[in-house]
């Protein structure tokens, strides 16, 4: 069941109270790809890609349940993570770190598959709960299932074949107009198929990015909220 209570229990079971989840996208700008209007404002040194400062989205444990819910509400059917063997080491405080040089994360929609390639770092505390989950995305691809466009492509091929087999000048103006109208309709149908569902230049849905942006604002105000609570001081 995709409800907030389920995701709260999930996060409490697998994430530590001070857990953070980071999504670094600094490699997009370095590769020359400039996402339009969606580039995040959070910055930090990224150990995975070496960007200093790196750029991306940072989420705290408090907002993760809502983010998970919105992700699946916005059309994601399934997420799959593939990774090679990790480099494992332990920090002085007892935390266990797993670093994957090659990781692939796939988001499966009904009519689209978004494949992200990058590096992954996961830090577990002594209770084996996640304190840091960091994915550094190098690029992503948007793949459309073959079954989705096969019918339109086949019809376009048939129309082109029929048109080529007519002798030059043998088509009447009405026949030519009919062929052009059919071709335009098929192209519009194919374009509509390729445009749905809508993801932005980072491969995220609009609703999910909006929630990420709200979480950025909440994170930036967290110290102020804690200070107000500790000193019993209101906003006015």
Residue ranges with predicted function:
Residues 1-236:
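Terminal "cap-and-tail" regions of soluble proteins that handle hydrophobic small molecules
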């Amino acid at each position: 069941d995709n409800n907030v209570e389920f995701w709260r229990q999930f996060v409490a079971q697998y994430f530590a109270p001070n857990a953070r989840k980071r999504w670094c996208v600094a490699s997009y700008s370095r590769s020359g790809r400039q996402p339009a209007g969606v580039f995040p404002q959070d910055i930090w040194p990224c150990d995975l890609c070496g960007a200093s400062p790196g750029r991306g989205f940072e989420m705290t444990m408090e907002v993760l349940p809502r983010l998970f819910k919105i992700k699946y509400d916005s059309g994601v059917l399934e997420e799959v993570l593939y990774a090679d063997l990790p480099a494992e080491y332990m920090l002085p405080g007892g935390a266990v770190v797993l670093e994957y040089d090659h990781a692939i994360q796939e988001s499966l929609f009904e009519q689209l598959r978004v494949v992200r390639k990058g590096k992954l770092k996961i830090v577990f505390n002594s209770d084996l709960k996640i304190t840091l989950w960091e994915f550094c995305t190098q690029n992503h691809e948007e793949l459309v299932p073959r079954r989705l466009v096969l019918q339109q492509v086949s019809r376009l091929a048939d129309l082109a074949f029929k048109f080529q087999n007519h002798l030059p000048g043998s088509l009447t103006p009405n026949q030519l107009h009919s062929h052009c109208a059919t071709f335009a309709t098929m192209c519009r149908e194919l374009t509509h198929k390729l445009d749905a569902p809508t993801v932005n230049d980072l491969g995220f849905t609009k609703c999910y990015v909006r929630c990420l942006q709200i979480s950025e604002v909440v994170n930036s105000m967290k110290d102020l909220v804690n200070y107000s609570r500790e000193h019993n001081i209101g906003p006015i």
